[in-house]
Amino acid sequence: MKRKPGVRELELGAASAVPPKALPLPPPTGEAMAMLARRGLRPEKTTGDLPFPAQLEEHVAARLSEWLGHYAFRLFLRGAIQKPESFLPVETTRYVALERSTEYAEASVDLGLAEISSRGRYTLKYPARSFGGTLEWYVGRELARRFGFDVETGVKLHVPGLGGDLDVVAAAEGKLIYLELKSSPPRNLAANEITAFCDRLNLLRPDLSLFVVDTALRLSDKILPMFLEEFQRRGYGISGKKRIAAQLWALTPRIYLVNGSRDLMMNIGKAIAAGFRALAPEVL
């Protein structure tokens, strides 16, 4: 049997070892990123995929955020992004009347997002690949503005086997909140996206997590059953599942399913409030 090294040999070996190199990453900025670092992760902020400059003047950002609070405007902008060459207002979405979509196109010009090209057509000045980055920007900004969270969006973790970025992470009251945002309608969501979300929860262990689908459609038809099936496959308990409001579900006291019906940020706020109450100590 091979002899184990003694105390002296262990100490000599450790003392003669080459000092470890410092990680080539800047220190985390903000409490949300610091909480990820304390979990042994290497969070890195990515460049946002936005149809506007990342550093907007505050008065422009405030007006844009106000427009994004309208579900119809989000539908319009999502459709405009899908037509990078040029678009007519009526081509952006079939769910918004021509008069309103024209108003949104003119607002986009006023905000500096678009310009008039020719024959009533418009072109986005800063093409984006999808609406996802804009949704992250809006939700992150409103979490900070309305609730005082420290927020980061589009965070890469450099973890093998864990694809994609963290859409939104937020910190307050010593708690870490993770939000995954989906800008596609429920019919476009696949089971592997639910699986990936649960994998991220296992890695992050956030105090509170929200799976947010920016749609007015019912989540109980497809998305909720997909979550229950995934939870059952993983052996998670689902006895605590309950509806908090219309299409706002508490899958567990820490995991919430949210849609964008009527007021997206109000729905997110309700889920956060329910989660914070569930995590709070008993009064008596």
What are the residue ranges of the model-derived segments?
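Intrinsically disordered, low-complexity Ser/Thr/Pro/Gly-rich regulatory segments
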Residues: 1-284
